[in-house]
Amino acid sequence: MKPRHIPVFDGHNDALTRLWLSDHPDPVHAFIHERLVGHLDLKRCQEAGFIGGMFAIFLPPYSYVQQHHSNKLFDQNASDFTQQQIEQICLEQLDLAHQLAQYSKNIKICTSVQDIQDCRAEKKLAIVLHMEGAEALQQNPDLLDVFYERGLRSIGPLWNRPSRFGHGLNAKFPHSPDTGAGLTSDGKDFIKRCANKKMVIDVSHMNEKAFWNTVDILQQPIVATHSNSHALCPQARNLTDPQLKAIRESKGMVGVNFDVAFLRSDGQRNADTSIDVILEHLEYLMDRVAPLLHPRSKLRKGTHKRTPGRAGDAD
């Protein structure tokens, strides 16, 4: 008898970026019909009761692409992506998401809660499109409308890099989340535009000043899709108790990040880490954010080191 799986809706994964980086001649076909290298593909989602999640459109650091996927570079002699290239990369990942839905009757891009509920009932994989770091939208304001019309419903305005919208957040350990300036005036206006579209605003990669800027702007639940407790792991990426209190007061939620460097009290990226460490963060967050609502979101594909005993989503 197969084990019965609890339905999982994942708060954050990097599957689209991995497909964009893939050397496979047909990564969309591979995701649908094969077992891809990494943690996430359709078959393992179905085996694990993985009903869907927030699929991130993300610009990988230039240095990472240069070192590991140099065939994806537009100019081998450049030192960074141009704005036009940033926009193209993100649009290509958006196209990959639509190809997944086009070529599989078991995958759907969802733009509403009802869509997600329908996918669960029909045993389809629900893709909610998210953008992690909004650099692709910083020069051409109309691009937000383009991405929205094609299904984007969640956005993390900042990543670790500085942009027109704000300072970003360096993942320092040990360190407080106060790593620099907060949102720029353009960043505040951008968040207001996204909020007017009823989009989810993800604070997971915001430094402390940007976080509080966002709290002051939003009249909606505050969401951190993949962040942990700073009290348990003093990593700048994690959330302090006052931040958790603000999220609770907004009726928001926090998803646990499975990257062990953001879980362990010593900040080490050591895969030999007990699952008990995850449970400790989960219990801490539930107690402080939503004792009656237990979000179990995970940073999956894209994590450098995961806890042992898990080869992928089926585990």
UniProtKB/Swiss-Prot annotation:
Residues 296-308 have a biased composition (Basic residues). Gene3D superfamilies: Metal-dependent hydrolases (3.20.20.140). GO terms for biological process: proteolysis. Residues 296-315 are annotated as: Disordered. PROSITE patterns: RENAL_DIPEPTIDASE_1, RENAL_DIPEPTIDASE_2. One of its GO terms (molecular function) is metallodipeptidase activity. Belongs to the metallo-dependent hydrolases superfamily. Peptidase M19 family. This is Uncharacterized protein in PQQ-III 3'region. It comes from Acinetobacter calcoaceticus. The lineage of its organism: Bacteria, Pseudomonadati, Pseudomonadota, Gammaproteobacteria, Moraxellales.
